[in-house]
């Protein structure tokens, strides 16, 4: 009887702790479920930011057509990635760029918008464009887990485990 009381108390504790995590997740997913279901009725005006730059000669030499990497998808050279970070406040380190004969293209998807960087390999002209679709789009993308990164993936996993713990402890408490 003492052992049963111990397990019942432990189950109650796990149940209320997991319910707190579930409550946070359910609030977010409930609201974004409604916004996703009515996406066509929620007007959004994307904000687009565009910048044009010219690569310095020493960096242009890193991307000329005769300096292609062995694969058509490869990261930008480190010095070029550092320059992009300094000039545009955009971290492209480790991201694969599409290397064609004419240009380099780096896709930069993110929740609630997207961005891209294009560098003309002949002239060294660089174009950067960032689109922000607003906070509702941001939350909707979190709901779908689109372009959200490792931290959000971990949150989704923790939320799923908390839901399982909540459900299972609830069933055992009923027993």
Where are these regions (language model features)?
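Extended, hydrophilic extramembrane loops/domains of integral membrane proteins
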Residues: 108-163
């Amino acid at each position: 009887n003492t052992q049963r009381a111990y397990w019942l108390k432990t189950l109650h504790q796990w149940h209320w702790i997991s319910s707190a995590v579930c409550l946070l997740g359910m609030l977010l997913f409930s609201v974004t479920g409604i916004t996703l279901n009515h996406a066509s009725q929620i007007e959004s005006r994307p904000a687009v930011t565009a910048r044009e730059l010219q690569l310095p000669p020493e960096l242009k030499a890193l991307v000329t057509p005769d300096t292609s990497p062995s694969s058509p998808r490869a990261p930008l050279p480190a010095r070029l990635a550092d320059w992009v970070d300094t000039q545009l406040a955009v971290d492209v380190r480790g991201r694969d760029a599409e290397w064609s004969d004419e240009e380099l293209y780096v896709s930069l998807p993110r929740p609630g918008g997207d961005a891209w960087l294009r560098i003309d390999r002949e002239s060294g002209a660089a174009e950067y464009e960032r689109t922000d679709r607003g906070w509702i789009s941001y939350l909707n993308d979190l709901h779908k887990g689109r372009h959200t990164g490792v931290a959000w993936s971990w949150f989704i996993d923790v939320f799923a485990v908390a839901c399982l713990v909540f459900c299972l402890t609830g069933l055992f408490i009923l027993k």
